[in-house]
């Protein structure tokens, strides 16, 4: 086992604090409407330019191992805030730095670190309750656009696009961000349920100009099996032909004789048919077939539950207003499934989301909810260069997370004002002893830090602005973009409550651990390895030479 370097007490804390400050100073220059960019060097390709706090934090590694431990702990704050709310990473870092700096001063002055931490925790718990009380629900498009604009660094077009996307697909809908092809940002909305499977044969195409299959009011056959024998399907095909409607077959696979017969029937115009593979694999495929069945009011023909394809009737088939199938995707528009059944299915999947342990599973389940409950919107980000594209895409992603958080828990006044108001309301809060009272004051003082940093980045005097804001009440604050005071809600400067809450909770959690640190242990730097020089080896060789 490698030898360790151990530091105690003040020596350890000073080193750790230095690391905290290096990382936080790099991150906090990005805060606010007048925050600056940070350029990150990459081992290959062009450097990345960003104003995203967590992207900056992730890039920082310090040479001194003790300082690096401090930096990594603050990086954890930014990462946790990012995971919880998708935004507010810079705010969380600024809060953590303020609490650690003030807290370690108190420790150096002889306060008990454990009581300080208890005081900080007490203040944060009370602050979270106050934030909830200040929170206003965010439901209209204008507020959603404002939240998106602020989070995308005052880019109004991004805010409007996100509000429009949420308007189109609903709050449950999936909104994804992709690279665009032009200079302008675009919004693409897919109505209905879409999945990534195309037609099994190009001979099904009935719209040669678009290369797609479009079927109006079709029946939809759902089968959890491979279909290779056409005899199994004859009863269903005959019934559909009599009804004079088209048929869409969604099965594990359709192959051989069955596929050939369907193609011939389609080309002769006997019955319009199109076949696609079912989406997903294994258990996920079964679940997605069941989703489609719920949406279209059909039944999945599955041998697991004793159903046979030969015995299927028109009652077992789903229906939709329209189905569009192209080379890669199938879209089912306006399924005839009962609303109550769809809502029941959505509730069931939501329960699974709560119980899901992996992020991947959770994401796939959320996609299924969106496809059932809303739709899918794609924001295509336009930019002139790849470097700009990366930076803009990261901002749009942040804005998207912020608007989701706003819809979830509401909004509070932005620009650091909400935390200043919360701190003022908690001025009378006391702990069980004097050291806890100091801890409470440390946390309350730290709550001014985001406002001060926004002002500092705008080139103004933080203390003057902070005092002016504290002298006001309610949503009165400072708009750093226009350098004027007024009602932050009227200015359209809103922060999602969830983002502010998460930033404060994670900052206090990690900062509390750092304040109570008394000892730090790391590997000693490895000295130069002893040189097992060429001479020794060659000596042996010389001996061998003598033997020859």
From Swiss-Prot:
It catalyses: ATP + H2O + a folded polypeptide = ADP + phosphate + an unfolded polypeptide. The keyword Transmembrane helix does not apply. CDD domains: GroEL. The keyword Nucleotide-binding applies. Its EC number is 5.6.1.7. ATP binds at residues 30-33, 51, 87-91, 415, 479-481, 495. Its main location: cytoplasm. It is found in: Cytoplasm. GO terms for biological process: protein refolding. InterPro entries: Chaperonin_Cpn60_CS (IPR018370), Cpn60/GroEL (IPR001844), Cpn60/GroEL/TCP-1 (IPR002423), GroEL-like_apical_dom_sf (IPR027409), GROEL-like_equatorial_sf (IPR027413), TCP-1-like_intermed_sf (IPR027410). GO terms for molecular function: ATP binding; ATP-dependent protein folding chaperone; isomerase activity; unfolded protein binding. Forms a cylinder of 14 subunits composed of two heptameric rings stacked back-to-back. Interacts with the co-chaperonin GroES. Belongs to the chaperonin (HSP60) family. HAMAP family: CH60. This is Chaperonin GroEL. It comes from Klebsiella pneumoniae (strain 342).
């Amino acid at each position: 086992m490698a030898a360790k370097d151990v530091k105690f007490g003040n020596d350890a804390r000073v080193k750790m604090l230095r690391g905290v400050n290096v990382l936080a100073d790099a991150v906090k220059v990005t805060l606010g409407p007048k925050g600056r960019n940070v350029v990150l060097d990459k081992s290959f390709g062009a450097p990345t330019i960003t104003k995203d706090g967590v992207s900056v934090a992730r890039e920082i590694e310090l040479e001194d191992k003790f300082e690096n431990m401090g930096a990594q702990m603050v990086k954890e704050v930014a990462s946790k805030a990012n995971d919880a709310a998708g935004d507010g990473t810079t705010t969380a870092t600024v809060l953590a730095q303020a609490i650690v700096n003030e807290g370690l001063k108190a420790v150096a002055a002889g306060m008990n670190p454990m009581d300080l931490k208890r005081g900080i925790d007490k203040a944060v718990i009370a602050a979270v309750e106050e934030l909830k009380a200040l929170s206003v629900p965010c439901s209209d498009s204008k507020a959603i656009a404002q939240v998106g604009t602020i989070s995308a660094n005052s880019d109004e077009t991004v805010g409007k696009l996100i509000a429009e996307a949420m308007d189109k697909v609903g709050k449950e809908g999936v909104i994804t961000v992709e690279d665009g092809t032009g200079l302008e940002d675009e919004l693409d909305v897919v109505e209905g349920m879409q999945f990534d499977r195309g037609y099994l044969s190009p001979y099904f195409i009935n719209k040669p100009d678009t290369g797609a299959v479009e079927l109006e009011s079709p029946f939809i056959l759902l089968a959890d099996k491979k279909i290779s024998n056409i005899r199994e399907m004859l009863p269903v095909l005959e019934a559909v032909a009599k009804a004079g409607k088209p048929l869409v077959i969604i099965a594990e696979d359709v192959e051989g004789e069955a596929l050939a017969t369907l193609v011939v029937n389609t080309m002769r115009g006997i019955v319009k048919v199109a076949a696609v593979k079912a989406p997903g694999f294994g258990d996920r495929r079964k679940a997605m077939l069941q989703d489609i069945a719920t949406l279209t009011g059909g039944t999945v023909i599955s041998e697991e539950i004793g159903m046979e394809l030969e015995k299927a009737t028109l009652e077992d088939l789903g229906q939709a207003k329209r189905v569009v199938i192209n080379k890669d995707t199938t879209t089912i528009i306006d399924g005839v499934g009962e609303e109550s059944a769809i809502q029941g299915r959505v509730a069931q999947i939501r329960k699974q989301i709560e119980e899901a342990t992996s992020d991947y599973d959770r994401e796939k389940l959320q996609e299924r909810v969106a496809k059932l409950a809303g739709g899918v919107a794609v924001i295509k980000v336009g930019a002139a260069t790849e470097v700009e594209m990366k930076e803009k895409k990261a901002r749009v992603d942040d804005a998207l997370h912020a608007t989701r958080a706003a819809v979830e828990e509401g909004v509070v006044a932005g620009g650091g004002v909400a935390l200043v108001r919360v701190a003022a309301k908690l001025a009378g809060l006391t702990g069980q002893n004097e050291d806890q009272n100091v801890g409470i004051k440390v946390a309350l003082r730290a709550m001014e830090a985001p406002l001060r940093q926004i002002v500092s980045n705008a080139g103004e005097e933080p203390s003057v602005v902070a005092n002016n804001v504290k002298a006001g009440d309610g949503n009165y604050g400072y708009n750093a973009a226009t350098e004027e005071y007024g009602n932050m809600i009227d200015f359209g400067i809103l922060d999602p409550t969830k983002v502010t809450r998460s930033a404060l909770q994670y900052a206090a959690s990690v900062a509390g651990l750092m304040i109570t640190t008394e000892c730090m242990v790391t590997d000693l730097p490895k000295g130069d390895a002893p040189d097992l020089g060429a001479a020794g080896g060659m000596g042996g060789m010389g001996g061998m030479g003598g033997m020859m």
